[in-house]
């Protein structure tokens, strides 16, 4: 298992530098994109974490991936990625990206939420749901949507550790439990 405290140190340092430059959101987006590219390609992951490859080979791969990201990457992120190559810490990249995003959200007063519905939600319904969740949590809520036909209907929203479940599937399960108890 990856030592999260190491990833946290790199994420915090990158956040501090990105915040000073006023580029936190851009760095977060680019770091997530970079980590996603690496995570989705097993060969890239192997090159970046396998000790059989030299630092120079890893650095060339990292530089190539940075160039492949649309719009390039911020200088602070590029320097951090080069440092990770130099220190053989690229195995922590996914955790660094996740922790960076979480810390940036916390610093900005945001919280991420996941909305699951049986069918795609219209934009106005999603906006209304987001506004309701913001009122409940007293924070700016960023929603990610997902479709799960097994819900049958309704919506399930998780914000932080709190689950708001208004799905028909859950309501049917509750009715089944109540009927069994009688």
From Swiss-Prot:
- Which keywords does UniProt give here? ATP synthesis, Cell inner membrane, Cell membrane, CF(1), Hydrogen ion transport, Ion transport, Membrane, Transport
For this protein, the record's SUPFAM superfamilies field holds: N-terminal domain of the delta subunit of the F1F0-ATP synthase
Chief place of localization? membrane
Give the InterPro entries listed for this entry. ATP_synth_OSCP/delta_N_sf (IPR026015), ATPase_OSCP/dsu (IPR000711)
User: Transport: present as a keyword of the record?
Assistant: yes
Q: Which Pfam families match?
A: OSCP (PF00213)
Record's GO cellular component terms: plasma membrane; proton-transporting ATP synthase complex
Tell me where it resides. Cell inner membrane
Provide the GO MF annotations for this entry.
proton-transporting ATP synthase activity, rotational mechanism
What is the role of this chain?
Answer: F(1)F(0) ATP synthase produces ATP from ADP in the presence of a proton or sodium gradient. F-type ATPases consist of two structural domains, F(1) containing the extramembraneous catalytic core and F(0) containing the membrane proton channel, linked together by a central stalk and a peripheral stalk. During catalysis, ATP synthesis in the catalytic domain of F(1) is coupled via a rotary mechanism of the central stalk subunits to proton translocation. This protein is part of the stalk that links CF(0) to CF(1). It either transmits conformational changes from CF(0) to CF(1) or is implicated in proton conduction.
Family under the similarity heading: Belongs to the ATPase delta chain family.
User: What subunit structure does UniProt give?
Assistant: F-type ATPases have 2 components, F(1) - the catalytic core - and F(0) - the membrane proton channel. F(1) has five subunits: alpha(3), beta(3), gamma(1), delta(1), epsilon(1). F(0) has three main subunits: a(1), b(2) and c(10-14). The alpha and beta chains form an alternating ring which encloses part of the gamma chain. F(1) is attached to F(0) by a central stalk formed by the gamma and epsilon chains, while a peripheral stalk is formed by the delta and b chains.
The protein in question is named ATP synthase subunit delta
Provenance organism: Myxococcus xanthus (strain DK1622)
Lineage runs:
Bacteria, Pseudomonadati, Myxococcota, Myxococcia, Myxococcales
